[in-house]
Amino acid sequence: LKKEGAVFIGKASMDELAMGGTNTTCYTGNAHNPWNTDRMTGGSSGGSAALVASGVVPMAIGSDTGDSVRKPAAFNGVVGVKPTYGRISRYGIIPYASSLDHVGYFTGNVEDACLTLEVLAGRDERDMTSSFRPVEEYSANLNSDMHGKKIAIISNVIEGIEKQDTKDAFYAVVEKLRARGAVVEEYSFNEDLMKAILPTYFIIANCEATSNHSNLDGIRFGVREDGADLQEIMTNSRTKGFGPLIRRRFVIGSYGLFEENQEKIFRKAQKVRRVIVEAMNACFKEYDAIIAPASGDIAPLLEGNTVETLSDEHIIAENYMAMANFSGGPSMTVPMGFKEECPLGLNITCNAWNEQTMFDIAKAIEEETGLKDLHAEVK
């Protein structure tokens, strides 16, 4: 970015260690949604999304391990992109879960999203997971003609959403894609697999995070607390140095990594991940992309928000986007409408290295809705 003349103005708020979906666990306090400051930005990269939505910057960087770029993009009315695993170097990023982590970013419109990826993508010898594949000219090749495109609607997500306003906004976009020549059809994944996405994500992510952050012991890295001996120093440091959400995730991760639990918890989750990816691959043999609302509703309230954690809306509709982290394929969110003066988002996911197709569909949606470069007036 610096090489291409970008000017950096600061760092954005984010959830602690990028673990969270609310941006309410940041050391500096809650991030507030610029469209309604009583509501969340989403997380973990919510601060970056809010800055683009406020018009402070045209582009901001984030990271996406489960949906940490794409969900805040939906809540803040901006474009959020998670490219293919390995498309952007992760050098310099503090890891959360290495097999799921992606560098992502936010922009105000699809064309800027194309240009940004052209700059950020490419091989980096400092990151062995970065790809040698040539970087495409996404912006020059941008084509919003939908004739010949075959798109699948994830019906499991639609069925899990309770708010009719969200469904209406989504299907209004679907009809516009059909009018442009796209074939858009309902597609059902195995319901048990869809319900397995969230627990599979939490097991893999928490186990990998526990390993990645084991050096934050107050001795080598991190906040140091006093203690009578080495064990007490480490215990106090890792207890007082992290918020309750992080401590809970580390406990879950440690449990999954116990020798006696690895096969039945961690490795089993990896096997389930593979089955989910195989189901996605089967879908992509028939379709160019899969789409669904990025969330069941507008951004939740910061106070008084209640979540039915066992509902299909929470288990499936609010957490299905981790599928793209499992597969490593490109996925992005674009604005699709408004409710109560707050934005709603639509997610597009494609097979690995099909960023151009993803951008083309996003551009068609943007042209039909007219929702681009949206800037909230913060009150």
Report each predicted region and the residues it spans.
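Charged, often glycine-rich, active-site loop that binds/positions anionic groups
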Residues: 29, 196-212
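Glycine-rich phosphate/pyrophosphate-binding loop
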Residues: 224-248
